[in-house]
Regions:
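Beta-rich strand-turn-strand
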Residues: 55-94
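OB-fold and OB-like beta-barrel modules that bind single-stranded nucleic acids
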Residues: 10-13, 33, 71-82, 101-104
């Protein structure tokens, strides 16, 4: 039987994406993504619990992230878990589990505020139903 390695997240970037170009000019981008779950404890108090995920994007998705995403951007990510092992300079074994994204959807609503902050508007981010001819009530 085949296994399934599928991750789906909606969350906010913890910092601007980093991008670097590997041999062959292949772009790779990384950023932390925060997801927050809220629940009530036994006393009815709302508790928020945030998990941090390391996201890795390759090629076109990496360039898209570099161009349009910034700290606090809300995104939908689909991908798979990937664990890397290596030794640092002191020969200490390190482990990192990351989410290699196959799909990225930008969920932030387009606003002029982004343009003022130096961020370009997202292509295709217009809502085709916004300000449409609504039937009068």
């Amino acid at each position: 039987m085949r296994g399934v390695n599928k991750v789906t997240l909606i969350g906010n970037l913890g910092k601007d994406p980093d991008i670097l170009y590997l041999e062959g000019n292949i772009p790779v981008s990384k950023f932390p993504l925060a997801t927050t779950e809220t629940y009530k404890d036994k006393n009815g108090k709302l508790i928020s619990q945030t998990e941090w995920h390391n996201i890795v994007l390759w090629r076109g998705l990496a360039e898209l992230a570099q161009k349009y995403l910034h700290k606090s951007s809300l995104v939908y990510i689909e991908g798979r878990l990937k664990t890397r092992y290596w030794e640092d300079r002191d020969h200490i074994r390190k482990v990192a589990t990351e989410i290699v994204a196959d799909n990225l959807i930008m969920l932030d609503k387009r606003s002029d505020q982004h343009a003022e902050e130096g961020h370009e508007p997202l292509p295709g981010s217009e809502n085709p139903f916004e300000d449409s001819d609504k039937p009068s009530e």
